[in-house]
Amino acid sequence: MALSREEIASRYSKALFAYAQDANSLDAVHEDMNVLLQVAKENPDMLRLLSDPIIRKNQKEEFLSSFSDKFSSETKNFLDFLLEYRRFESLTAIIEAFNTLYDEYKNIASGTAVSAIKLNEDELSRISQAYAKKYGFKELILTNKVDPSILGGIILKVGDRIIDGSIRTRLQQIREQLIENR
């Protein structure tokens, strides 16, 4: 039975993570994978070329070596492994799953700060540091989403946790209390 894309990503990312960890090159492999992810997203033809069964393996190896010379040996070995087992079509899913494992291991969280107006980098950084400290994360990487309907304040979404400090929600709570106390 053929494996689904998610199963392939899960298995291969776990194998890469364990391999990089054993070789004490987890951070280097993580950097390499993020470079690859960026390149793959900007050049989708690259994955099509490396996944194409018509193109000979030695041509694919030449192509790979043309841009992988700065990667760690563990990353190069992993790319060769993907080439050997014809799994390049799953590369982006594998990298995303690897990044999730890496973030969990390093206690790094990602989330969204929803605000009525765009937050500058300093504001986003202060919110990120305060939340990370309060909830025990080593680091919190926040992206800002603007939603004028919240009127003011902030809604933080990190993992399955939502902290709603918006004026809209506070006004709704006050309204409900007033109706309740009639």
Curated annotation (Swiss-Prot):
Report the subcellular localization: Cell membrane
Topology with regard to the membrane? Peripheral membrane protein
State the InterPro entries in the record: ATP_synth_OSCP/delta_N_sf (IPR026015), ATPase_OSCP/d_CS (IPR020781), ATPase_OSCP/dsu (IPR000711)
Family, similarity comment: Belongs to the ATPase delta chain family.
From which residue to which does any coiled coil extend?
A: none
Q: How does it assemble?
A: F-type ATPases have 2 components, F(1) - the catalytic core - and F(0) - the membrane proton channel. F(1) has five subunits: alpha(3), beta(3), gamma(1), delta(1), epsilon(1). F(0) has three main subunits: a(1), b(2) and c(10-14). The alpha and beta chains form an alternating ring which encloses part of the gamma chain. F(1) is attached to F(0) by a central stalk formed by the gamma and epsilon chains, while a peripheral stalk is formed by the delta and b chains.
The entry's function note states:
F(1)F(0) ATP synthase produces ATP from ADP in the presence of a proton or sodium gradient. F-type ATPases consist of two structural domains, F(1) containing the extramembraneous catalytic core and F(0) containing the membrane proton channel, linked together by a central stalk and a peripheral stalk. During catalysis, ATP synthesis in the catalytic domain of F(1) is coupled via a rotary mechanism of the central stalk subunits to proton translocation. This protein is part of the stalk that links CF(0) to CF(1). It either transmits conformational changes from CF(0) to CF(1) or is implicated in proton conduction.
Q: Which domain of life is it from?
A: Bacteria
Q: List, alphabetically, the PROSITE patterns matched.
A: ATPASE_DELTA
Q: What keywords sit in the KW lines?
A: ATP synthesis, Cell membrane, CF(1), Hydrogen ion transport, Ion transport, Membrane, Transport
In Swiss-Prot or TrEMBL terms, this protein is called: ATP synthase subunit delta
The primary gene name is atpH
Organism whose genome encodes this protein: Lactobacillus johnsonii (strain CNCM I-12250 / La1 / NCC 533)
